[in-house]
Regions:
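Conserved active-site alpha-helix within GNAT-family acetyltransferase domains
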Residues: 109-132
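Conserved beta-strand in the GNAT
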Residues: 49-51, 56-77
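Active-site rim helix/loop that mediates acceptor-substrate recognition in acyltransferases
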Residues: 26-54
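Conserved N-terminal entry element of GNAT/NAT acetyltransferase domains
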Residues: 1-13
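Conserved GNAT acetyl-CoA-binding A-motif
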Residues: 99-113
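Conserved small/polar residues in nucleotide/adenosyl-binding loops
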Residues: 146-148
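Short glycine/proline-centered loop/turn elements that form peptide/ligand docking sites
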Residues: 92, 116-118, 135-141
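Conserved acetyl-CoA-binding loop-helix of GNAT-fold acetyltransferases
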Residues: 78, 84-97
Length: 149
């Protein structure tokens, strides 16, 4: 059964799992400096950092913001060794049951094949693509903004 377990940096084993998976799963321009992420995790009340478990097996992580009217998912990744096993689908189902307000996800523009695959995955699971381009402010000062939808 899928469940989310909130973590802080004091949960060393799980936090290390999350950080390593983040770095492995996303290019550097798509996540903030790790020291800033640690601060957000420990000190920002509406930022939620969770390990995704299937029973007792950690399978991934998800971070999201609670903005009162909606939730904004910042990062979601599963262990590469476990991908294509239905965990993404089951995690999204759990997410939609767990969070009772609208959920906003962000994906890069559908230019590259992986971006198209991500978009199709989310659409297959009930999410709608906003067909307007916009630019996300950079997570890191030295890296430019990213084109997203």
């Amino acid at each position: 059964m899928i469940r989310f377990q909130p973590i802080t940096t004091s949960d060393v084993q799980h936090y290390k799992f999350m950080e390593e998976l983040l770095v492995e799963s996303f290019p550097p321009e798509e996540y903030r400096e790790l020291e800033h992420l640690r601060e957000y995790t420990d000190r920002i009340g509406n930022f939620h950092n969770n390990i995704i478990f299937d029973d007792d097996l950690p399978i991934g992580f998800i971070t999201y913001w609670d903005f009162d009217e909606f939730y904004y998912v910042e990062h979601f990744a599963t262990n590469p060794a476990l991908r294509n096993g239905g965990y993404g689908k089951r995690t999204l189902e759990h997410l939609c049951e767990f969070l009772k307000r609208p959920i906003v996800l962000e994906v890069e523009s559908p230019v590259e094949e992986m971006a198209k695959r991500r978009i199709n995955f989310y659409q297959r699971h009930g999410f709608t693509l906003w067909e307007k381009d916009y630019y996300q402010p950079p997570y890191k000062e030295e890296i430019g903004r990213a084109s997203c939808r």
